């Protein structure tokens, strides 16, 4: 016997659909049946059609209803390392702080770190994220199951490179086999909320065989590849000297046929015009992480990507390179930083670069395209999954609402996000995390993080005279 699906009505709200025409319904409503959107339309119509059969009806009193944000680059297992690598260069960041930290993590550390990160993601409206690569995917899986959100999880994969911790030295075949096992065990689990991708940490830690085999197995399994690409000039210089190409990482990846539509290219800061063209022709998706880029990497050519037709989404990166896992903050920064970049490179201001509506696309439907899930998430449309956030704009931070779409990018704070639904279930309701005891997680994380840093031997400088 078929189980009756609960019917939830969200009405009397401003429905920001992010569909292909970017429809916004001023006095709109969404009907949700089980885990999918059943109907969208004016409040009067939806109430007339469904009010007598609804299991729950929520009057939003003018609040915004939007698709959940898709964070396309986040290291959830780095959340316990928040604050351990501030104000240092990338190589110090990597070799002296992050690798010692990550290489001493246990599966339990990864689980707790992902829970803590997940709380911050949910509070800032994220319903789906792409893990950029960690050591203990089973711990992440356990946490995502509990959090109730959606994820594309990736193992941090390296088969070569200087300075790797001893317990990270794997052969190419071991790297591929471990990821295939993760795929077989966890892909499409947690009611379909978890997908397993293949990871390439960066080209400096990948042999050609790892690149080739990852390319082929991901294509065979119809899944994605998540890779840090063209982060710093040194990376390009190294590729030019070792691979015999005329520019860098992207030119080499084009040469070996890795620039395909299932490649998520994180950061992608140091590209020339030809390489931007390679991304566009290959259907490569870019995850723009403005906060961490400003700290460690530089100005990514976002305007040029968009003009070339490259799909650009947003990511927060990990806590040690950003500290804030908020897509709300990243939206604000994405617009401002790229306006600033335009002035820097051209000597003239151009406030029209990366406008608010473009940023909203980057955070929603472009994010869904980036994680290869746009057939089900990223916009509010009939038949898609019910991944929804409710925003209260009636606070000091957002009032007045002369231009509501602009306000969502330039004025919204995480505190404006009141409720979050993923897969038709509330994961935050009226600012309260539903599936976890948040206070217990925070207390456990403080203790676990301290123990982990001690095991890793990471010593931080004294910035001031503590007494």
Language-model-derived ranges and their functions:
Residues 1-28, 32-38, 43, 48-50, ...:
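Active-site microenvironment of metallo-dependent hydrolases
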Residues 13, 30, 35, 62, ...:
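Divalent metal-coordination and catalytic microenvironments
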Residues 80-112, 155-173, 232-262, 333-354:
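Active-site gating loops and adjacent loop-to-helix segments of metal-dependent hydrolytic enzymes
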Residues 82-149, 175-191, 446-454:
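Alpha-helical scaffold segments that flank or form the walls of functional sites
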Residues 130-134, 197-213, 294, 370-373:
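Active-site glycine- and acidic-residue-rich loops that bind
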Residues 140-270, 274:
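Metal-coordinating catalytic core of metallo-dependent amide/deamination hydrolases
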Residues 255-262, 303-395, 411:
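His/Asp/Glu-enriched, well-ordered alpha-helical/loop segment
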């Amino acid at each position: 016997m078929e189980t009756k699906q609960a019917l939830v009505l969200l009405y009397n709200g401003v429905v920001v659909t992010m569909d292909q025409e970017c429809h916004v319904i001023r006095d709109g409503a969404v009907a949700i049946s089980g885990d999918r959107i059943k109907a969208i339309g004016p409040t009067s119509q939806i109430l007339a059609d469904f009010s007598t059969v609804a299991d729950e009806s929520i009057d939003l009193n003018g609040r915004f209803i939007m698709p959940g944000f898709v964070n396309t680059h986040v290291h959830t297992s780095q959340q316990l390392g928040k604050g351990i690598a501030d104000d240092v260069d990338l190589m110090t960041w990597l070799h002296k702080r992050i690798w010692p930290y990550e290489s001493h993590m246990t599966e339990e550390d990864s689980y707790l770190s992902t829970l803590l990160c997940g709380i911050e993601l949910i509070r800032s409206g994220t319903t789906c994220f792409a893990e950029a690569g960690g050591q203990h995917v089973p711990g992440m899986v356990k946490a995502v199951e509990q959090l109730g959100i959606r994820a594309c999880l990736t193992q941090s994969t390296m088969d070569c490179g200087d300075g790797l911790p001893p317990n990270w030295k794997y052969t190419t075949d071991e790297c591929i086999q471990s990821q295939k096992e993760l795929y077989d065990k966890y892909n499409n689990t947690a009611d379909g909320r978890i997908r397993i991708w293949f990871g390439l940490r960066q080209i400096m830690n990948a042999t050609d065989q790892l690149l080739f085999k990852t390319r082929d197995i991901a294509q065979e399994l119809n899944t994605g590849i998540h890779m840090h690409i063209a982060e710093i000039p040194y990376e390009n210089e190294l590729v030019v000297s070792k691979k015999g190409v005329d520019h860098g990482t992207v030119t080499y990846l084009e040469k070996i046929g890795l620039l395909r539509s299932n490649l998520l290219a994180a950061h992608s800061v140091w590209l020339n015009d030809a390489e931007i063209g390679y991304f566009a022709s290959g259907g490569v998706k870019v995850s723009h992480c403005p906060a961490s880029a400003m700290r460690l990497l530089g100005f990514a050519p976002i305007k040029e990507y968009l003009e070339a037709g490259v799909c650009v989404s947003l990511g927060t990166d990990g806590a040690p390179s950003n500290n804030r896992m908020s897509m709300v903050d990243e939206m604000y920064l994405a617009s401002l930083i790229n306006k600033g970049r335009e002035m820097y490179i051209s000597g003239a201001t151009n406030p029209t670069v990366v406008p608010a509506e473009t940023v909203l696309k980057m955070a929603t439907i472009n994010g869904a395209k980036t994680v290869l899930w746009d057939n089900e998430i990223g916009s509010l449309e009939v038949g898609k999954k019910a991944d929804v956030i409710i925003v209260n704009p009636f606070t000091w931070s957002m009032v007045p609402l002369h231009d509501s779409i602009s306000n969502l990018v330039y004025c919204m704070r995480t505190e404006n996000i009141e409720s979050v639904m993923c897969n038709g279930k509330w994961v935050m309701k009226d600012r309260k995390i539903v599936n976890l005891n948040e206070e217990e997680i925070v207390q456990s994380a403080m203790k676990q993080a301290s123990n982990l840093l001690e095991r890793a031997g990471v010593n931080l400088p004294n910035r001031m005279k503590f007494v």
